[in-house]
From Swiss-Prot:
It comes from Xenopus laevis. Residues 126-136 have a biased composition (Pro residues). GO terms for biological process: hippo signaling; positive regulation of transcription by RNA polymerase II. This is Transcriptional coactivator YAP1-B. Transmembrane segments: none annotated. Belongs to the YAP1 family. It is found in: Cytoplasm; Nucleus; Cell junction, Tight junction; Cell membrane. Residues 1-13 have a biased composition (Low complexity). Keywords: Activator, Cell junction, Cell membrane, Coiled coil, Cytoplasm, Membrane, Nucleus, Phosphoprotein, Repeat, Repressor, Tight junction, Transcription, Transcription regulation.
């Protein structure tokens, strides 16, 4: 059933639908019936809307048309009963407060009110005298006066909060400037310390490092090794090429005419701590770089370099080169 639609004639055995309602039976031509229903709902002007009945013709109780009894009045003194629409009072309050709001705002912004607010903020004890003008007059009891007083209180509270906010900003601003002035020295004092240089690095090298114009040199505590894209070295600690152990063993076994024992090499390697192997970039056989054996061999070779090469040394070198050509596939690693 749809309200506001046209009424169709009903069957003889059925009750007629209520006034303003329509019963649609979808039997054969559903499209036509649905279109009729749609037009009736979308165009209610063409529908038969019942007219409003007067109060005397409506089905109302008899007590509605009689005067109330004396005990049923809302005011027992004068025996009267009245009812007023509450919306009228709201509209009257709005109409009263609308023209009076600009003078209130203008009065609040006067220098006298500003001085009173400043005195109330500086001396809280004097706040009751400053708020005395806000109290409503004794003769004003209407709703318009209460609304105006409430609006004035809200405006004064808003102005007081604004002044308090400005005062807080003025107090915080010097502290903020003082903190900002202290931040650069703190950053300079808390800068990263210079790395501890070893005894082998000279003072000139440290001066060049500290006074360098390159911004990347002084950016951190120490330099970090970056990955290279063209040298074939990665960031891992095993990227540095090493001499195979088989090659060193074969060289030690050669007959070079000097009594070099096998125990000298491990003693040189054991002089360095084991934790150096775990550091990145230190996976190098440090025993071959420097040592007592290197110094001894250098001292022994210095006087012999001025002498002519003997045939025994040449024969030994040919033997070594021949052995190297035969076994180079087993111990040489080409990079």
């Amino acid at each position: 059933m749809e309200p506001g639609s046209q009424q169709q004639p009903s069957a003889p055995g059925q009750q007629p639908p209520p006034v303003g309602h329509q019963i649609v039976h979808v039997r054969t031509d559903s499209e036509t019936d649905l279109e009729t229903l749609f037009n009736a709902v979308m165009n209610p002007k063409n529908a038969n809307v019942p007219q409003t009945l007067p109060m005397r013709m409506r089905k109302l109780p008899d007590s509605f048309f009689k005067q109330p009894e004396p005990k049923s009045h809302s005011r027992h003194v004068d025996q009267t009963t009245t009812w007023q629409d509450p919306r009228k009072a709201m509209l009257s309050q709005i109409n009263i407060t609308a023209p009076t709001s600009p003078p209130v705002q203008q009065n609040i912004m006067t220098p006298t009110a500003m001085n009173q607010q400043r005195l109330s903020q500086s001396a809280p004890v004097k706040s009751p005298p400053a708020l005395q003008p806000q109290s409503p007059p004794s003769g004003v009891l209407g709703s318009g006066g209460n609304q105006q007083m409430r609006l004035q209180q809200l405006q004064m509270e808003k102005e007081r909060l604004r002044l308090k906010h400005q005062e807080l900003l003025r107090q915080v601003r010097p502290q903020e400037l003082a903190l900002r002035s202290q931040i650069p020295p703190m950053e300079q004092d808390s800068g990263p310390p210079n790395p501890v240089c070893s005894s082998g690095i000279s003072q000139e090298l440290r001066t060049m490092t500290m006074n360098s114009s390159d911004p990347f040199l002084n950016s951190g505590t120490y330099h970090s090794r970056d990955e290279s894209t063209d040298s074939g070295l990665s960031m891992s600690s095993y990227s540095v090429p090493r001499t195979p152990d088989d090659f060193l063993n074969s060289v030690d076994e050669m007959d070079t005419g000097e009594a070099i024992t096998q125990s000298t090499i491990p003693t040189q390697q054991n002089r360095f701590p084991d934790y150096l192997e775990t550091l990145p970039g230190t996976n190098v056989d440090l025993g071959t770089l420097e040592g007592e054996a290197m110094n001894v061999e250098g001292e022994e070779l210095m006087p012999s370099l001025q002498e002519a090469l003997s045939s025994d040394i040449l024969n030994d070198m040919e033997t070594v080169l021949a052995a190297t050509k035969l076994d180079k596939e087993s111990f040489l690693t080409w990079l």
